[in-house]
Amino acid sequence: MTSAAQSNPPLTRSVDELWLDVLQQISARTAHELKGALNGVAVNLEVVRSRSSRSDAAAASVASFASSAADQLDAVVGMSEALLTLARAPRDPLEIGETMHCFASLLSPSASADGGSLRIEGASREVVSGAVRASGNVVRLVLGAALLAALARKGDIRWKVDVGQEIVVHIESADAEGPLEVSSEVSAAADAAGIRVHGEGQSMSLTFPRAATTSARTRTHERA
């Protein structure tokens, strides 16, 4: 069992430095999948262009390639938008739901490529929106580090959020190999920001203080 409430060593790197390290790891996982999707778009569009140039070309002969190109382009746009959002300075207070979906957009493809999955549980089309009192990069750091720790197991990862007086993110790995935990530096940063990190077995809970001025709400998420 691990907990940020336990004594942690003082930070040797700033929160921004720690977050940059986590973002680089996320980008490295995403790069291969993003390049693959871009190559897929290019290949399928070239097939469409080549076949469409024939005088006897039928629409049916290019339809499947055009559809594949559109699907891959959607994936490219989703990953690119998520990466740009996380690369920009956060707006405080940070919306937990938007941040979770940015991570999911970036990390789900690589999880699938590794033979696992990453899914936000609950109603699959709902995003729980709640603003967190801790600074944006601390929230990103703790969420990102916890997800990377879970994804290192190369299994099925499920996470969900409960919003009450506090915002609690639950991450669970189907892999039973060792406890799920983050580094002592991340734990120390979380502790200093009032974020509680509790790991037990294959699960971890991250408890964030709510921003006093923003209430939780649920909105429909348009993506499957």
Roles of regions detected by a PLM:
Residues 2-26, 34-74, 131:
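Histidine phosphotransfer helical core of two-component systems
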Residues 2-11, 153-156, 176-224:
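Flexible, glycine-/charge-rich segments associated with ATP-binding catalytic modules
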Residues 21-43, 131-157, 182-192:
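Conserved ATP-binding N-box helix of the HATPase_c
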Residues 60-117:
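Conserved DHp (HisKA) dimerization/phosphotransfer helix of two-component histidine kinases, i.e.
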Residues 89, 124-129, 156, 203:
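Conserved catalytic core of two-component sensor histidine kinases, primarily the HATPase_c ATP-binding
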Residues 117-133, 164:
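Conserved catalytic submotifs in the C-terminal HATPase_c
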Residues 119, 158-160, 198:
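Short beta-strand patches within cytosolic ATPase/nucleotide-binding catalytic cores
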Residues 136, 154-173:
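Short beta-strand/loop element within the Bergerat-fold HATPase_c
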